[in-house]
C-alpha cells in the first residue's frame, strides 16, 4: 500500500476545540480524529532557526503532526509531486501515511511539533536516503 500512496493521501484534520474564558481543550482519540491506533507519541522542540527535521519516509508507519505551539511547514513528496502544508493551530493536524517523504521546515521561534505515530520505533521502517525512497516507490 505505501508504495502507491501519493500526496493526495496526506490530509489536514480539524480537531474539535472546546473553549471558554478559561481557555481551550482539544481531544484526540484513536480511530476517531486519528485515522489509526496511536502506539507512540513524541514531540520536537527547541529547533534552532533555519533547521529542519524529518527528511525521511516510513514503510508502514502513519503519522499525525500537530503544531502544539507556534508553527511550521511540512513538505511532502510522493516521488512525483511535492506539496507544502502549513501548520500553526493546535486544533489542526496533518495525517502523513506511509510511503510519503516528509520534511518539517520553517519552524517559528518556540514551535512545538507533536507527533502521534501508528507504530513503535523501528529503524527498519525508516527510509532515510532519498534515492532509497525513490527505489522503494518505483519497485
Where are these regions (language model features)?
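Non-catalytic, conserved peripheral segments adjacent to functional cores
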Residues: 1-94, 109-139
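Short beta-strand-centered segments at strand-helix junctions
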Residues: 96-99
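Beta-rich strand-turn-strand
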Residues: 101-108
Amino acid at each position: 500500500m505505501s508504495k502507491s500512496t501519493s500526496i493526495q493521501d496526506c490530509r489536514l484534520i480539524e480537531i474539535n476545540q472546546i473553549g471558554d474564558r478559561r481557555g481551550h481543550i482539544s481531544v484526540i482519540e484513536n480511530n476517531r480524529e486519528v485515522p489509526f491506533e496511536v502506539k507512540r507519541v513524541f514531540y520536537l522542540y527547541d529547533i534552532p532557526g533555519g533547521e529542519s527535521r524529518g527528511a525521511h519516509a516510513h514503510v508502514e508507519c502513519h503519522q499525525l503532526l500537530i503544531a502544539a505551539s507556534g508553527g511550521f511547514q511540512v513538505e511532502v513528496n510522493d516521488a512525483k509531486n511535492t506539496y507544502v502544508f502549513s501548520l500553526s493551530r493546535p486544533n489542526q493536524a496533518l495525517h502523513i501515511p506511509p510511503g510519503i517523504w516528509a520534511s518539517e521546515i520553517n519552524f517559528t521561534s518556540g514551535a512545538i511539533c507533536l507527533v502521534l505515530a501508528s507504530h513503535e520505533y523501528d529503524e527498519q521502517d525508516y527510509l532515510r536516503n532519498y534515492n532509497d525512497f525513490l527505489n522503494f516507490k518505483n519497485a
